[in-house]
């Protein structure tokens, strides 16, 4: 496999993952904001449960990590823009684990009548989703820049 093909495949999966994250931040999050707190408390655990079982969601977020290993073994770090994009992708995923997962857990533990706490968690989730989407978008841009050289 040529380096260009390997990078193109990595870019495709990274772009698919970034698209999913951007959809969550720009479409699904505003829809969650329209829900009352009790409905949000029911919806978010269901969304999380379905997301972790989704072949698409898990695949597009996992394939780049798995593919990075042979990429770095074979091609090292000779394409700095591409490597920077992979680093941003890793950062976006790490940010998701650090920021989003605790929110999912807290919302699942809250009762539907804890309106103020649910409202605050939803606000935090919106911020976390936007951060993750922005970093994911930057990762795709950085990786794509490599193809201009």
Residue spans for each PLM region:
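Interfacial loop at the N-terminal end of multi-pass membrane proteins
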Residues: 2-10, 14-61, 108-123
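Juxtamembrane boundary at the C-terminal end of a transmembrane helix
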Residues: 144-149
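A cytosolic-side transmembrane-helix exit/cap motif
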Residues: 99-111
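Mid-bilayer segments of alpha-helical transmembrane spans in multi-pass integral membrane proteins
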Residues: 90-98
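Core segments of transmembrane alpha-helices
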Residues: 57-71, 132-141
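Interfacial segments of alpha-helical transmembrane regions
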Residues: 2-15, 64-67, 76-91
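Membrane-water interface of alpha-helical transmembrane segments
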Residues: 1-7, 51-55, 72-83, 123-129, ...
């Amino acid at each position: 496999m040529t380096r260009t093909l390997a990078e193109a495949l990595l870019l495709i999966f990274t772009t698919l993952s970034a698209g999913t994250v951007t959809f969550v931040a720009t479409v699904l999050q505003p829809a969650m904001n329209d829900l009352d707190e009790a409905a949000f408390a029911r919806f978010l655990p269901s969304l999380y449960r379905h997301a972790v079982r989704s072949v698409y969601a898990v695949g597009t977020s996992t394939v780049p990590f798995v593919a990075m290993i042979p990429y770095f073994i074979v091609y090292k770090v000779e394409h700095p823009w591409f490597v920077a994009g992979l680093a941003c992708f890793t950062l976006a995923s790490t940010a998701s684990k650090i920021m989003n997962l605790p929110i999912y857990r807290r919302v699942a533990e809250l009762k539907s009548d804890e309106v103020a706490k649910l409202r605050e968690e939803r606000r935090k989730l919106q911020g976390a989703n936007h951060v993750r989407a922005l970093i994911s978008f930057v990762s795709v841009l950085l990786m794509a820049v490599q193809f201009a050289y």
